[in-house]
Amino acid sequence: MTILLVGLGAALGAILRYQLTRIGNHIASEFPLMTFLINLTGSFCLGWLTGSQLSQPVTLFLGVGVLGGYTTFSTLNSELSQLWFRRRYHIFFGYWLLTYGLGLLVAAAGFYAGL
């Protein structure tokens, strides 16, 4: 049953990420805004989930499943690599610092919101 919950959640999270990315593709910018926003909102939600007192099945469905499928570490690093190899160093460092710096802050904010 747990595997089904996680798998269903992952599918829902991936579909949500895909749809948001499609919407965001209309924004012409070198900065990968949609991946940035997806990862920050996912960090906040995972922080909230960690601070909350939800049951283990709900936590697995939402945390491992939905948010695991929604957030995207691999796309982040792929985009960072592309920026680096295209010598867009100012965007690379801004994206890197903002994603990891704000990611930690919003995860902490989510954690405290979930208490």
From Swiss-Prot:
<comment type="function">
    <text>Fluoride-specific ion channel. Important for reducing fluoride concentration in the cell, thus reducing its toxicity.</text>
</comment>
<feature type="binding site">
    <location>
        <position position="71"/>
    </location>
    <ligand>
        <name>Na(+)</name>
    </ligand>
</feature>
<dbReference type="InterPro" id="IPR003691">
    <property type="entry name" value="FluC"/>
</dbReference>
<dbReference type="GO" id="GO:0005886">
    <property type="term" value="C:plasma membrane"/>
</dbReference>
<keyword id="KW-0407">Ion channel</keyword>
<keyword id="KW-1003">Cell membrane</keyword>
<keyword id="KW-0813">Transport</keyword>
<dbReference type="Pfam" id="PF02537">
    <property type="entry name" value="CRCB"/>
</dbReference>
<feature type="transmembrane region" description="Helical">
    <location>
        <begin position="1"/>
        <end position="21"/>
    </location>
</feature>
<comment type="similarity">
    <text>Belongs to the fluoride channel Fluc/FEX (TC 1.A.43) family.</text>
</comment>
<keyword id="KW-0472">Membrane</keyword>
<dbReference type="GO" id="GO:0140114">
    <property type="term" value="P:cellular detoxification of fluoride"/>
</dbReference>
<dbReference type="GO" id="GO:0046872">
    <property type="term" value="F:metal ion binding"/>
</dbReference>
<keyword id="KW-0479">Metal-binding</keyword>
<protein>
    <recommendedName>
        <fullName>Fluoride-specific ion channel FluC 2</fullName>
    </recommendedName>
</protein>
<keyword id="KW-0812">Transmembrane</keyword>
<keyword id="KW-1133">Transmembrane helix</keyword>
<dbReference type="GO" id="GO:0062054">
    <property type="term" value="F:fluoride channel activity"/>
</dbReference>
<keyword id="KW-0915">Sodium</keyword>
<feature type="binding site">
    <location>
        <position position="68"/>
    </location>
    <ligand>
        <name>Na(+)</name>
    </ligand>
</feature>
<feature type="transmembrane region" description="Helical">
    <location>
        <begin position="91"/>
        <end position="111"/>
    </location>
</feature>
<feature type="transmembrane region" description="Helical">
    <location>
        <begin position="57"/>
        <end position="77"/>
    </location>
</feature>
<feature type="transmembrane region" description="Helical">
    <location>
        <begin position="31"/>
        <end position="51"/>
    </location>
</feature>
<keyword id="KW-0406">Ion transport</keyword>
